[in-house]
């Protein structure tokens, strides 16, 4: 990898100003779709520029259409979900949250439920419950090398 870029999806949500709806509210679905399309387009542009692109953020299967479209157009797209047990997920999230404890706990529990059974994408899950950050990085590299999480 000679050139790479990491796109943090949260950054794109922070670009929203006037009229922004918190992304966890049900009425934010259309806004969230626009944001996902925006960072998908940014990823494709960097890829065309010769960069390996890593998208770091919460992207559920319900928002994969832009990525499936990119894969159909020949972009190499890998979809991996890093998931720990509920208990570990809550502990990790609370340690790094900018929200109050109650709100953060509620949001993480909702998201964990959304990601605890991904149906046909369950094979794309990397269980990070017992992994260190370094071990998780190695798991991601192994999955990329094998191509097992490449979507077409």
Language-model segments: residues:
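Conserved substrate/cofactor phosphate-moiety recognition/catalytic segment
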Residues: 1-44
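Conserved phosphate-donor/acceptor-positioning beta-strand/loop module used by diverse small-molecule
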Residues: 73-93, 126
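Small-molecule kinase domains that catalyze NTP-dependent phosphoryl transfer to phosphate-bearing small molecules
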Residues: 95-139, 148-152
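Glycine-rich phosphate-binding loop used to anchor ATP phosphates in small-molecule kinases
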Residues: 30-78
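Conserved nucleotide-binding/hydrolysis micro-motifs of P-loop NTPases
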Residues: 11-13, 83-88, 131-132
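Hydrophobic "lid"/C-terminal helical patch
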Residues: 43, 140, 144
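Amphipathic alpha-helical transducer elements in NTP-driven molecular machines
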Residues: 32-40, 83, 109-112, 137
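Short, hydrophobic alpha-helical segments
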Residues: 47, 144-149
């Amino acid at each position: 990898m000679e050139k790479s870029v990491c796109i943090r999806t949260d950054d794109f949500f922070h670009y929203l100003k006037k009229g922004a709806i918190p992304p966890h509210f049900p009425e934010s679905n259309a806004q969230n779709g626009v944001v996902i399309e925006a960072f998908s387009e940014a990823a494709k542009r960097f890829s065309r520029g010769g960069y390996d692109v890593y998208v770091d953020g919460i992207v559920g299967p319900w928002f994969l259409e832009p990525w499936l479209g990119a894969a159909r157009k020949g972009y190499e797209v890998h979809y991996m979900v890093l998931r720990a047990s509920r208990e570990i997920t809550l502990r990790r999230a609370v340690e790094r949250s900018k929200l109050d404890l109650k709100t953060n706990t509620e949001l993480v529990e909702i998201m964990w439920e959304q990601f605890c059974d991904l149906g046909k994408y369950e094979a794309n899950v990397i269980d990070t419950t017992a992994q260190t950050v370094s071990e998780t990085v190695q798991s991601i590299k192994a999955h990329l090398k094998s191509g097992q999480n490449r979507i077409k």
